[in-house]
From Swiss-Prot:
<dbReference type="Pfam" id="PF04055">
    <property type="entry name" value="Radical_SAM"/>
</dbReference>
<feature type="domain" description="TRAM">
    <location>
        <begin position="380"/>
        <end position="443"/>
    </location>
</feature>
<dbReference type="InterPro" id="IPR006638">
    <property type="entry name" value="Elp3/MiaA/NifB-like_rSAM"/>
</dbReference>
<feature type="binding site">
    <location>
        <position position="51"/>
    </location>
    <ligand>
        <name>[4Fe-4S] cluster 1</name>
    </ligand>
</feature>
<keyword id="KW-0808">Transferase</keyword>
<keyword id="KW-0819">tRNA processing</keyword>
<feature type="domain" description="Radical SAM core">
    <location>
        <begin position="147"/>
        <end position="377"/>
    </location>
</feature>
<dbReference type="GO" id="GO:0005829">
    <property type="term" value="C:cytosol"/>
</dbReference>
<dbReference type="InterPro" id="IPR002792">
    <property type="entry name" value="TRAM_dom"/>
</dbReference>
<dbReference type="InterPro" id="IPR023404">
    <property type="entry name" value="rSAM_horseshoe"/>
</dbReference>
<feature type="binding site">
    <location>
        <position position="85"/>
    </location>
    <ligand>
        <name>[4Fe-4S] cluster 1</name>
    </ligand>
</feature>
<keyword id="KW-0949">S-adenosyl-L-methionine</keyword>
<keyword id="KW-0411">Iron-sulfur</keyword>
<comment type="similarity">
    <text>Belongs to the methylthiotransferase family. MiaB subfamily.</text>
</comment>
<dbReference type="InterPro" id="IPR007197">
    <property type="entry name" value="rSAM"/>
</dbReference>
<dbReference type="Pfam" id="PF00919">
    <property type="entry name" value="UPF0004"/>
</dbReference>
<dbReference type="InterPro" id="IPR013848">
    <property type="entry name" value="Methylthiotransferase_N"/>
</dbReference>
Length: 444
């Protein structure tokens, strides 16, 4: 008798941490005999790996569940799982069960490694499960990691966050900060390099505070030194960096390590000291501007990107003007801009001075117009230069072109053969757009 094919599809929402979680769940399922499929209609298991940083992300999940309900009606044996940060919030798992009773499994951030076993139990018992445990359990090592997916890979170095910014739900759903042992991180990086990976991105909610809980003297600068020493590795990236914890030692370390890319994602969130204090960010605009100057002094040509929130409770027009002024001063290469979204359970959600959506939308529009003009001007200044690009594969918008990224994290689109995927090539930049540049490969 031929065994039934076991298939799965994971749909990921949110940040790189979620992308890495999804990779881990895929590895666990493949080790359990499942195979990934491209289309939801082909899947015996569908998993939504969720984000709850903003209300919009949660609404996308509820919308997707509505679409998947039709598949469940056509195939009652289909297992539907909702996993990740959204589920970890108090009361949300029960809310999902009420709104979407056809969901079979609700799985918290601290229980993802139990996924294959839980799916088999659900298939055998025909009974839904809610498994939402402590999000601050010990770091689990030696989970299966299948062959690398191309030349790039994410490597988690910390879990959780200790900062408790007043707008942010992450510490409540990811738990307190826990660092992985450096030897386990280096082991994983070496294994990835042996499989053909040449670029790793080190992941954490705040990579700059890596090692504080290990009590053996290791910090993020020291970890970067060790990763930089791995033979065969060509590039190191890292996200996210908290400005408060970006030490002078870290700046100088990054400046002299040849594999660390010349790009820092440095979320500022606001340009007003009053709003930064209300957010509990732990730094001032003056500190941030000094840090930017220090980075540019030590690392010529560095690109800087950031996150910005408009419409935080109590934000006045003068506060918002401070944000516009900071953006104009720093000249970010790119910025991820958002309207403030109240998150239940956070301090900011109950602050006085909640702003109307119309004001938030108007401020977001002005901020985006300013930043887009800066991004375009900075990209136009690069036209004519020759840059190193790691080819990531066919362009999503034009499959006949290749796409890749420079060391400064610029997205480059250029003609070339798909066999170059995973290779480092030289590209001369010929045209600039707001979000990307176009170019031509240089022979040899």
């Amino acid at each position: 008798m031929v065994k039934a094919r076991k298939t799965f599809k994971i749909i990921t929402y949110g940040c790189q941490m979620n992308q890495r979680d999804s990779e881990m769940m895929a590895d666990l399922l493949q080790d359990a005999g499942y195979e990934p499929v491209a289309r939801e209609e082909e899947a015996g298991v569908i998993i939504l790996d969720t984000c709850c940083v903003r209300e919009k992300a949660e609404n996308k999940v509820y919308g997707k569940l509505g679409q998947i309900e039709k598949l469940k009606s056509a195939n009652p044996d289909l297992v539907i799982a909702v996993a990740g940060c959204m589920v970890q919030q108090p009361g949300v798992a029960e809310k999902i069960r009420q709104q979407a009773p056809y969901v079979d499994l609700l799985l918290g951030t601290g229980n993802l490694q139990e996924l294959p076993q839980l799916i088999e139990e659900i298939k055998a018992m025909h009974r839904p499960r809610i498994v939402v445990g402590e999000q601050e359990g010990p770091v689990v090592e030696d989970l299966p990691r299948r062959r690398a997916r191309g030349a790039q890979a994410f490597v988690t170095i910390t879990y959780g966050c200790n900062n408790f910014c007043t707008y942010c739900i992450v510490p409540y759903v990811r738990g307190r900060e826990r660092s992985r042992r450096p030897e386990n991180i280096i082991k994983e990086v070496k294994e990835l390099v042996d499989q053909g990976v040449i670029e790793v991105t080190l992941l954490g909610q705040n990579v700059n505070s890596y090692g504080r809980d290990l009590r053996d003297g290791i910090n993020f600068a020291g970890l970067l030194e060790r990763v930089n020493a791995v033979e065969g590795l060509k590039r190191i990236r890292y996200v996210t960096s908290h400005p408060r914890d970006f030490t002078p030692e870290l700046v100088t370390t990054i400046s002299r390590l040849d594999k660390v890319c010349e790009h820092v994602h440095l979320p500022v969130q606001a340009g007003s000291n009053r709003i930064l204090e209300l957010m509990h960010r732990g730094y001032t605009r003056e500190h941030y501007l000094e840090l930017v100057a220090d980075l540019r002094r030590h690392i010529p040509g560095i690109s800087l990107t950031t996150d910005l929130i408009v419409g935080f409770p109590g934000e006045t027009e003068a506060d918002f003007e401070d944000t516009l002024d900071l953006v104009a001063r720093v000249q970010f290469d790119n910025a991820f801009t958002f309207m403030y979204s109240p998150r239940r359970g956070t301090e900011a959600a109950t602050m006085p001075g909640q702003l109307p959506t119309a004001i938030k939308k108007e401020r977001l529009k002005r901020l985006m117009e300013l930043q887009n003009s800066i991004s375009l001007a900075k990209n136009e200044a690069l036209v004519g230069q020759e840059v190193e690009v790691l080819v990531e594969g066919p362009s999503k918008t034009d499959p006949d072109q290749l796409s890749g990224r420079t060391r400064t994290n610029k997205l480059i689109i250029f003609p070339g053969d798909q066999s170059l995927t995973g290779r480092l090539v030289r590209v001369r930049l010929t045209r600039a757009q707001t979000w990307l540049l176009k170019g031509e490969m240089v022979d040899g």
